[in-house]
């Protein structure tokens, strides 16, 4: 099963990073290939973890697919996880981890595990998954800069 991951160090607070990553409804505003997204079934469990359903339409290189995920956002763990409900995948799980840094800022890690049902789409995805994860992370970093500008902790050590 294909798996890819990317981690970046950013000057933003864990709260800012978590708010951005968990703001699923706004993904179409800054991730180009998400052409539509409906978020529903919002609830907060007894531990304060937020849950919702996301129904997305994704277009890439002439292919258009629809899929649904359950999204779990746990601020205390700095984790946002999207798990497949239905769609063109046999398996899909995207996990964001946001970890504070001692001197300010945070590390943001994204890991995606997936397997497409359609062999042609699987081959297209395999040829482009490194590009895709880089573009996803770049889209989030660009959106963070738009929303939060340069943070006081912009000189986060690498």
Residue ranges and their predicted role:
Residues 39-85, 139-146, 155:
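Glycine-rich portal/gate segments that line the openings of hydrophobic small-molecule binding cavities
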Residues 1-49, 103, 150, 158:
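Hydrophobic ligand-binding cavity/cleft-lining segments
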Residues 25, 129, 133, 137-149:
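Short amphipathic alpha-helical signal-transduction/dimerization elements
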Residues 9, 19-22, 72, 125, ...:
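Amphipathic alpha-helical interaction elements
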Residues 81-135:
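Beta-strand/loop substructures that line and gate deep hydrophobic ligand-binding cavities in soluble
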Residues 10-14, 56-62, 73-77, 88-90, ...:
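Beta-strand elements of well-folded, non-transmembrane domains
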Residues 17-21, 27, 54, 71, ...:
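Hydrophobic pocket/interface hotspot
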Residues 3-5, 53, 64-68, 91-94:
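Short, surface-exposed coil-to-beta transition loops
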